[in-house]
Each structure stands twice: as structure tokens, then as C-alpha cells.
Amino acid sequence: VNGRVYLNNQPYIQKLVLDQGYWKESLITAPDEEAYKNDIIKCKEMGFNGCRKHEKVEDPVYLYWADKLGFLVWGSMASFWSYTPQAAETFTKEWMDIIERDYNHPCIVVWDMLNESWGVTQIYENKQQQAFASSLYYMAKAYDQTRLVISNDGWEMCQTDICAVHSYMHGEKGDTAQHLRFE
């Protein structure tokens, strides 16, 4: 509302960690269910109130603990390698299944399906890829009008409820004038 995110009818600042979901012991699957709970508790102890899952559909057990512990989640999808009609069809079916599976988790506050144009590398000029990203946005909205949706997080956003800019400076002094455009 008015450019702000609200939770329980109150303005809410999301302080999120970008969560790759890697586990030292077991790579991208938690070593056990308790690990999910402990991971969320550690994030909260560090001052974060949620996470943006990165290129990973999270296990429902993680979402269960996020629900129980009051930890926000941006539900995400892993990118495909390159755009083809078959890849788009498969991706779309899987994404809709994920939304249907995870819809009832109150921890999810954003659906975030594409990341930085991965898999849709020509989206800036390619009308088919733009239509694909837009269709994902509208399908997510058709399934779930209660959550915010980002069609392509960080870069070329055809349709979006949140303007999320990924700016990588790696220690250099940033161009604050560029970032002020979004205030």
C-alpha cells in the first residue's frame, strides 16, 4: 500500500538474508529436520526477520518451522539453463505445483520465480521471454492474490509488485544517486 509492505495491517520492514540453503554436511538438503529450525533461530538471533530463498524451492519442513517461528520467506524457484518453449512449459508446470503446495504457509510473503534473467537471458529485447515472465507473474496472481509477486528479481522486471534491484559493488563506493531513484 502506497509503496510500503504491510504485515497484519502495519508497515513492515523486511530485513532478509539471502539464503542459498547450503549445508556443510549434506549440500542442498538439510542433514535433519532440526537443522531447519536451528537455521531459522540463528538468523533471527542475528536480527533478520526473514529470508529470500535463492534458486531453491525449500522443503516444506523448513516452511513449517518458518511458520512456527514467525520467519518470513520469499518463495523461490530454481532457474532453467536457457529459454526454449519446452523449458518454459516445464518450468511453468513446476512453479504452479509449488505455489499450490506451499500456498497455505503464512511465512511466505513473496513469490519470486526468476532471478536476474537467468534462463531468460534475452528478456531485455525478446518479446517471447518478456511474455513468459509476465505470464508467470499473472499466473501466480491468479493462484494467490494475497502475496506480492516478482517476475524477475533484481534485473529486467516485466511485471512486479516490488522493485528489487541487485547491485553488486563488492567493496567499491556505490553510486548513491542511482539508488536514490528508487526512494
Positions of the model-derived regions?
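Substrate-binding/catalytic cleft of secreted carbohydrate-active enzymes
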Residues: N38-I41, G50-E183
